Amino acid sequence: MKRDGNTPLGGLNRTKDRHTDMVPNVKSLPGSRREIAALQSERRRVAFERARQAPWYRGKLDHIRVDRLDDPEEWQKIPILDKDALRRFDHAGFMREFCVAPRNRIAEYWRSGGTTGKPVFYPRTYEDVAFGLISWGRSFPCMGIDANDLCHIAFPIGVHPAGQVWARSAQLYEVGMAWVGAGNVVPTAAQLELIDTLKPTVLMGMSSFALHMANSAEARGIDACALSVRKIVCSAEVLSNAKRQKLERLWGAEVYDVFGMSEAGLMGAENAAHDGIHIWTDLFDVEVVDPETGRRLPEGEVGTFCVTPLWTNHATPFLRWNSGDQVSYIERSSGSGPYAELFPMIRHANRTTGFFKVRGVNVNHTEFEDEMFGIEGITDFQAVLETDAATDLERLRLRVEVGRGTTADAVDAQLSAMVKARFEVSVLVDTVPPGTLAAEFEKSIKAPRFVDVRA
């Protein structure tokens, strides 16, 4: 595979100095997996040296041998970092402990995602932003999106990078972009009108909002399959198989999943084979580890996803960041093309926090969602774990929206029977008007489909 230009390692320039890196040719890819391995070896050392500058890491890395960072046994001695550690600090404390860049190098801030806990605002230098744009933009050619496409982006356009950084990255890859924004800013009816007017071929947004848009279109007598959208790109929440199939059926479109986070960037995307998410391993050093021991797991085993950004680390040099995702690592795709040849994949299992315990019974969120979206008459739902005021016992309440031709009584009976048989818990079912849940979900970066409001 031919490299682009005269820069080494597939266009990713070597370190200019200990603080900044040269910006690469954005469309250049490494020439081989061997080349990526050499690049990872070099960049691990840069990441490690930058982390040693952060006050939080003082005393935590002294036992690590820098000359042995490529040895998994040595690398695994580095402590794993997670969001709970960050939430102990207010913003000023976080900046003191983790930020190693001077104020005059900070270009912008990226807000953390998530539906629980206090958000964290990560400083990003001009170099971080440049590499971040590459990480988001790579998703377009990986998914077969090019200059012949127009994307309608329905993520929030603001301090969270999923909207504005992704939209900006499209310009680098010569992909058309309609900067629409989330449904709480541009109402669903207006978004459908824009799709009808501008004729985008790609819809980018949370899977929950894409479902809501299709349901809203049906309520207005519009067949979403007859619209111009041919691909749907989902992010910010786990895409279950049932939800993917429902989106494909409602829109008549091919659905793609991607994977990323504010702590690092967009780390990968599916290709046309849809057999996993290809991870840009020249930009990110990734591990799937045993959550108890922190040791790397063999291919195919489910464990905790950890990432060390190799380039977006000029301000916050995180090592072995625990994203809270349960995934498996797969070396090869059944697909073809440079992304399949160069980059390994991950496959989602579920989030580590992805279960309710209802009176001693574990209810897995992903499995529950699969069952819910597999029911024909249900268009959307929210599961609420609450406390019964009369008995002081916990109970599960389902708020559901139903399609035309489906009665609330029929759904109540069907859901109660399904949940009891499949998950061995009883539920209360509330049918809410169409659009109720989407209006609530639009206020969050990630749809709060499972909510714990116990007293």
Where do the language-model regions lie?
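ATP-dependent adenylate-forming carboxylate-activation enzymes
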Residues: A178-E193, N364-T366
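Adenylate-forming
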Residues: P200-R244, E254-E263
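Short hydrophobic/charged patches on amphipathic alpha-helices used for structural packing
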Residues: G137, A189-L192, G221, E369
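Conserved AMP-binding/adenylate-forming
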Residues: R230, L239-S334
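AMP-binding/adenylate-forming catalytic core of the ANL superfamily
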Residues: L203, W311-F423, F441, I445
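Conserved S/T- and glycine-rich ATP-binding loop of Class I adenylate-forming
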Residues: A51, S112-T115, C151, L203, ...
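Nucleotide 5′-phosphate-binding alpha/beta core
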Residues: K2-R111, G117-I134, R138-C142, A147, ...
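Conserved AMP-binding loop of ANL adenylate-forming enzymes
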Residues: G137-L172
